[in-house]
UniProtKB/Swiss-Prot annotation:
Gene3D superfamilies: Mediator of RNA polymerase II, submodule Med31 (Soh1) (1.10.10.1340). GO terms for cellular component: core mediator complex; mediator complex. It comes from Xenopus laevis. The lineage of its organism: Eukaryota, Metazoa, Chordata, Craniata, Vertebrata. GO terms for biological process: regulation of transcription by RNA polymerase II. This is Mediator of RNA polymerase II transcription subunit 31-B. Component of the Mediator complex, a coactivator involved in the regulated transcription of nearly all RNA polymerase II-dependent genes. Mediator functions as a bridge to convey information from gene-specific regulatory proteins to the basal RNA polymerase II transcription machinery. Mediator is recruited to promoters by direct interactions with regulatory proteins and serves as a scaffold for the assembly of a functional preinitiation complex with RNA polymerase II and the general transcription factors. It is found in: Nucleus.
């Protein structure tokens, strides 16, 4: 009985890891283009699987994600129009470029905010002495 429970736990762990890896792959527009060109998005069972994977948006699961933009892509994949557009390599390229721009600006903005916060803390420390 304990062996069966351990085996079930192991199967759940493996399934969790596989689904985590797959969901994170959805952050890659070139992979989405690959799936679209091979007709995966026309398969109703695959589209249903994408709907099932929306549970990753729950904070209980989302905390394990390294690439949070995969959740946005997963949400967009719920729309047939978006899935159809992904067949076009130019669409995937555009998404890829937009992601790069987002991260470039996000990094700069974050650095500026951190510098401003550090300066403010430094001023607070000197004024309280």
């Amino acid at each position: 009985m304990a062996a069966a429970a351990m085996e079930a736990d192991e199967q759940h762990r493996i399934r969790f890891q596989l689904e985590l890896e797959f969901v994170q792959c959805l952050a890659n527009p070139n992979y989405l283009n690959f799936l679209a060109q091979r007709g995966y998005f026309k398969d109703k069972s695959f589209v249903n699987y994408l709907k099932y994977l929306l549970y990753w948006k729950d904070p209980e699961y989302a905390k394990y994600l390294k690439y949070p933009q995969c959740l946005h892509m997963l949400e967009l994949l719920q729309y047939e129009h978006f899935r159809k557009e992904l067949v076009n390599a130019q669409c995937a390229k555009f998404i890829d470029e937009q992601q790069i721009l987002h991260w470039q600006h996000y990094s700069r903005k974050r650095m500026r905010m951190q510098q401003a916060l550090a300066e403010q803390q430094q001023q607070n420390n000197t004024s309280s002495k």
